[in-house]
């Protein structure tokens, strides 16, 4: 086993980032917690892995990370809390990132499927937490198993990047590592082939608003550091893995429209019904069902408010952020997804009356897509906290939003992650990405088993069409990895999970693995 701190190579002056920048309000809208991801490279589908030694992996990742940190200095930075101003800064001090490389004397077997929804600490790297100025905010662990399969796990902080930015980060890392996997003695200029990035974390500069006042304010920073106030008492959580096949997802979307139309002629209501102008996508239908089923399982009072937090679904709402040509500022690094919540009465968010689910899905879709750059800017600038009268209509999640009546859905199933990551001929592309369970959440000293009501959605292999097919599936070299359905990891408090799994619509459209 090798554990070490990797420092960046010296970089040309033209690639040097600023000394420090304040973390943007959009960054701080994300929870103060770790984002874990694990990528599996299967020897059964990549035969060259069997002959790739642990020493080769260690050398390539050491050299590759040195190059990567020179090109992507945000991963080797540190956070700094200025107590006088209450502001959080990202300080580009080149302190590096942590690398761990280990060999396990056992095969991978079905661990890559992560069907039990539990975190396997064997694969997990040191979790990065913002509590110490000298702690790194990016760590990586490379695990080689006796069968030749490799697991690459990372720990990043939600304040550093959202998932779209994380894929930018991993794409750059995979390119850097592939250079030295292909040729351990490779000589390369740091800026040769490097992606241009914008390190300013000034999201509002892209929204072209008339009001140029700076954010974040002292009020913003003070609130983000305040202890969470739980709307429901913390409780231990249980995990479930739900499989929605491509067929069941299409059936779900179609059924929501059919149910809405069945009652439309006889019911006087202000609900939206399907038409050529009012339509929903598969993601919208799935998110509506999950939000409604979780809310029903909680048995909330009809007057209670539940909020949907969709921090990511794979789309950038500011298209200019993805540009990296020489005339632009480069790819924007930081959180770019709408850090807002969508509040509704729990009576509206219910699967008990299935005819209302299309309307709920339509509301989710329009709320998300109508967050324009200008609205996003205003939400961040003027705070709009959910329960403070002085901060507008309540569009931005407080620290407590993931621990109360709310539901958080992170859907990365449509992001082409596998196509973008390539570690070269020996390691290849990852076969799958998984969270391998939801790791414990620590927020200002309070540790919970999981964020209650959190759904993390990834793409499932096309071969996963039944529980039996999932259990028997073993990829082979040359298999065409066609897009499949969606695998949903759901975390809920234990006493409510049974009610969730008894939901008749979930039983109709999902397989419990």
UniProtKB/Swiss-Prot annotation:
Keywords assigned by UniProt, alphabetized: Acyltransferase, Transferase
Biological pathway: Secondary metabolite biosynthesis
Transmembrane segments: none
Highest taxon, organism lineage: Eukaryota
EC class (word): transferase
Cross-referenced InterPro entries: CAT-like_dom_sf (IPR023213), Plant_Fungal_Acyltransferase (IPR050317)
Induction per the UniProt record: Expression is strongly induced under conditions of nitrogen starvation. Expression is positively regulated by the cluster-specific transcription factor rua1 that recognizes and binds to the specific 5'-T/G-G/T-C-G-C-A-T-A/T-C/T-C/T-G/A-3' upstream activating sequence found in all promoters of the UA biosynthesis genes.
Positions of the catalytic residues: 158 (proton acceptor)
EC number in record: 2.3.1.-
Keyword Ligase annotated: no
GO MF term list: acyltransferase activity, transferring groups other than amino-acyl groups
PANTHER family noted in UniProt: FATTY ALCOHOL:CAFFEOYL-COA ACYLTRANSFERASE (PTHR31642:SF310), TRICHOTHECENE 3-O-ACETYLTRANSFERASE (PTHR31642)
Family: Belongs to the plant acyltransferase family.
Function: Acyltransferase; part of the gene cluster that mediates the biosynthesis of the glycolipid biosurfactant ustilagic acid (UA). UA is a secreted cellobiose glycolipid that is toxic for many microorganisms and confers biocontrol activity to U.maydis. UA consists of 15,16-dihydroxypalmitic or 2,15,16-trihydroxypalmitic acid, which is O-glycosidically linked to cellobiose at its terminal hydroxyl group. In addition, the cellobiose moiety is acetylated and acylated with a short-chain hydroxy fatty acid.
Protein name: Acyltransferase uat1
Gene this protein is translated from: uat1
């Amino acid at each position: 086993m090798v554990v070490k701190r990797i420092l960046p190579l010296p970089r040309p002056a033209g690639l040097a980032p600023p000394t420090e920048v304040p973390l943007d309000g959009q960054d701080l809208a994300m929870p103060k917690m770790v984002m874990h991801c694990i990528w599996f490279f299967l020897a059964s589908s990549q035969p060259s892995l069997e002959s790739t030694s642990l020493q080769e992996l260690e050398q390539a990742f050491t050299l590759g990370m040195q190059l990567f940190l020179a090109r992507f200095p945000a991963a080797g930075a540190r956070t700094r809390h200025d107590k006088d101003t209450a502001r959080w800064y990202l300080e580009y001090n080149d302190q590096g990132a942590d690398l761990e490389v280990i060999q396990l004397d056992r095969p991978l077997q079905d661990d890559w499927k992560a069907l039990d929804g539990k975190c396997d600490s064997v694969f997990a790297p040191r979790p990065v937490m913002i509590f110490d100025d000298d702690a790194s905010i990016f760590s990586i662990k490379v695990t080689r198993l006796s069968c030749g399969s490799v697991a690459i796990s990372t720990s990043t902080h939600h304040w550093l990047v959202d998932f779209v930015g994380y894929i930018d980060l991993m794409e750059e890392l995979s390119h850097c590592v592939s250079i030295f996997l292909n040729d351990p003695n490779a000589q390369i200029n740091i800026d040769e082939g490097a992606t241009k990035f914008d390190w300013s974390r000034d999201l509002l500069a892209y929204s072209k608003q008339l009001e140029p006042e700076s954010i974040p304010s002292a009020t913003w920073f003070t609130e983000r550091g305040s202890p969470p106030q739980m709307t429901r008492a913390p409780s231990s959580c249980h995990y479930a893995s739900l499989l929605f096949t491509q067929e069941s997802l299409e059936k779900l979307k179609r059924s929501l429209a059919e149910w809405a139309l069945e009652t439309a002629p006889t019911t006087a209501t202000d609900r939206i019904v399907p038409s050529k102008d009012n339509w929903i996508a598969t993601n919208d239908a799935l998110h509506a069902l999950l939000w409604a089923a979780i809310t029903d399982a909680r048995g909330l009072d009809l007057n209670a408010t539940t909020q949907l937090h969709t921090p990511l679904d794979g789309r950038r709402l500011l298209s200019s952020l993805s540009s990296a040509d020489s005339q632009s500022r480069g790819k924007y690094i930081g959180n770019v997804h709408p850090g807002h919540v969508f509040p509704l009465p729990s009576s509206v968010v219910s699967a008990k009356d299935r005819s209302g689910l299309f309307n709920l899905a339509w509301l989710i879709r329009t709320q998300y897509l109508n967050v324009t750059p200008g609205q996003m800017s205003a939400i961040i600038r003027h705070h709009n906290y959910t329960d403070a009268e002085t901060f507008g209509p309540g569009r931005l999640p407080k620290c407590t939003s993931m621990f109360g009546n709310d539901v958080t859905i992170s859907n990365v199933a449509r992001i082409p992650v596998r196509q973008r990551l390539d570690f070269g001929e020996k390691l290849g592309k990852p076969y799958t990405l998984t969270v391998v369970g939801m790791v414990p959440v620590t927020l200002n000293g309070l540790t919970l088993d999981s964020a209650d009501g959190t759904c993390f959605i990834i793409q499932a292999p096309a071969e996963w069409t039944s529980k039996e097919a999932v259990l028997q599936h073993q990829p082979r070299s040359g298999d065409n990895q066609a897009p499949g359905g969606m695998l949903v990891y759901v975390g809920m408090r234990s006493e409510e999970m049974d009610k969730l799994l008894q939901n008749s619509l979930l039983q109709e459209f999902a397989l419990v693995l």
